[in-house]
Amino acid sequence: IWHRGAVDADGKSGDGAGIQIEIATDFFKEKIISSGQTPDETKRICVGMVFLPRTDYAGQEKCREIIESVLLEENYHIYGWRQVPFNSKVLGKTAEQSRPEIAQVMFKKNENLKTNDLERDLFETRKKIEKLARENQLKNFYICSFSSRSIVYKGMFLAEMLAEFYPDLNDQKLTSRFAIFHQRYSTNTFPSWDLAQPFRTLAHNG
């Protein structure tokens, strides 16, 4: 479906492409263990995929601080942060200039909740984080996904470069029973990393 997406004059920056997949338990267990923690086998692993301000280090730290404080306040245990590997060579000049810092926060709910109840709790927790980020006037902060079910990998690159930009997507442990792919053709809004799709719960073409 490459013909459905737009390309910048630099020939590499796309209007946005991405994929939503299931959270691969084995993959993230390995990442949690490598961070020095032991995953709780009785709890679902939750992952937040976030875009942080790349050049504003104070703002970046404040974003992490807000996420962590709200998670602890809402009775979550934080396993740790992971800097998401990427290959910037596939990006065009426009996409590289606006590229955010890309990170994942891995955590669990301390209490036992059914999956739907946990997802609702995660939704409310994310909204609190976003509200605090706005109140602190933090720029270039965006939560791509915040769930125990699914995760979104996306950005301002050509659709065929998705797995080249994110090496995670080539890892055999990153398995999923579903995949929602999207390539964007921007019409009335200027392309940006956060507007690439899929969004957290949908993908559409208007």
Predicted regions and their residues:
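N-terminal segments that mediate ammonia production and transfer
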Residues: 1-205
